[in-house]
Design a protein with these regions (language model features):
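Polar, low-complexity loop segments and adjacent catalytic/binding residues used for recognizing
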Residues: 4-288
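Extracellular modular ligand-binding repeats in secreted and cell-surface proteins
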Residues: 289-394
Length: 394
């Protein structure tokens, strides 16, 4: 579902590069819903009719991961995000109930200038290291003795012990905690990062948090104070744009990711399936205009006719020795569109190029027919272009 106003203003851009031109086009905020707004990468598929959750067509990560291998998957929003305007993302996720020493690593909600292909190769924000300069919100459900943050959070491989926090990767990809929240603690401490990501309850209506069921994650950004807020499992975390190493001038890809390293580390099969209701996910953001298909127009360039005297031609005759051909010039106008609706919202500076030179038409002509008894004489003293008739003598 895409929402946009019925009427849009059309802008004409001054001469500059396309990045500057699109940045001056102010589009309205819009809300999109559904998995058709995302591209899938890696180990991601659709579970049409889950038997344990009251939902259909769930997006599933880490399914049927071969024994002794790492599972990794991502969905990437089709348009880029900027932080000069507000951002609000809501998605329901259901965690795996496997032990956190062999099950899934968790959920990573990532902002990065790199794309999902780089994520598949380098990793994200759920382990000790991933792709360079990425940042986002991490729900960690998998313990690794190689990850200093897991140790700091006192995850320690105990069943269903997890945590959530904002994190950033440095230029080498090393992942560290930023923003609010105290490492360790308890599930009842609102200032603690600690969560029970799943449990063994058989009562879904006891009022407690059950992470294996579909629960909402809200990730929002307030542009006025440059602060991110994440809400999950009854707790709230915050981090600033600066703490995450992001800035307002750049555009970022937005990824929802999950992975399963425990299966590969243990060398035995372990279930690491993580599921999300991507079909019901909503994202409110302000899109940036994108380059569309340029508009082109052509215009005729008329040919010129040149007349040249040819003494070989009989007086009063003409001959076309080169036929004239019209030329053509093409004007190309950059077009900018709303990436959500495809609607034209602006024009760039037109450029005109001669695509075909005109060919002159050349006409040869003979001299004038001289009457009998008439003689032309050149007078160097006469004004230029003048002609004087002098009567002859009999």
């Amino acid at each position: 579902m895409n929402s946009a106003p019925t009427f849009m203003s059309l802008y004409s851009m001054p001469a500059s590069d396309s990045t500057n031109e699109t940045s001056t086009i102010n589009l309205p905020a819009t809300t999109v819903k559904g998995r058709n707004n995302y591209d899938s990468y890696g180990n991601v598929d659709i579970q049409e009719n889950p038997t344990d959750l009251d939902a259909k067509n769930l997006t599933r990560f880490n399914y049927t991961q071969p024994t002794g291998t790492f599972g990794v998957g991502a969905v990437q929003f089709k348009n880029q995000i900027t932080f000069d305007n507000d951002f609000d993302f809501n998605i329901r996720v259901a965690n795996n109930r496997q032990s956190n020493t062999t099950g899934a690593d968790g959920w990573g909600f990532i902002f990065s200038k790199n794309d999902a292909n780089t994520y598949l190769k380098d990793g994200g924000i759920l382990r000790e290291k991933g792709m360079a300069d990425a940042a986002g919100f991490r729900i960690d459900t998998g313990y690794s003795n190689k990850d200093p943050l897991d140790k700091t959070q006192k995850q320690a491989g105990q069943g269903y012990r997890g945590y959530a926090t904002f994190v950033k990767n440095d230029a080498q990809g090393n992942t560290s905690k930023v923003g609010s929240g105290n490492p360790g603690g308890s599930a009842t401490d609102p200032k603690s990062d600690f969560i029970y990501y799943a449990d063994n309850t058989t009562n879904d209506f006891d009022g407690k948090f059950h992470g294996q069921k579909l629960n909402n994650v809200n990730l929002k950004y307030n542009a006025s104070n440059e602060t991110f807020t994440a809400t999950y499992a009854g707790k709230t975390w915050t981090a600033t744009l600066s703490q995450l190493g992001l800035n307002k001038k750049d555009s970022y890809n937005f990824l929802v990711t999950s992975s399963q390293h425990g299966n590969g580390d243990s060398g035995t099969y372990a279930d690491g399936v993580m599921r999300t209701d991507l079909e019901g996910a909503t994202l409110t953001y302000t899109p940036k205009a994108q380059e569309g298909t340029p508009e082109t127009t052509t215009e005729k360039i008329p040919y010129e006719t040149k007349r040249e005297f040819d003494p070989k031609l009989a007086p009063g005759t003409e001959e076309v020795v080169q036929k004239g051909e019209n030329g053509e010039k093409t004007t190309t106008t950059p077009i900018y569109v709303n990436p959500t609706t495809g609607e034209k919202v602006g024009e760039g500076t037109p450029t005109t190029k001669v695509t075909k030179d005109p060919v002159d038409e050349i006409v040869h002509y003979g001299g004038e027919k001289v009457p009998q008894g008439h003689k032309d004489e050149f007078d160097p003293n006469a004004p230029k272009g003048s002609k004087e008739e002098v009567p002859g003598k009999p």
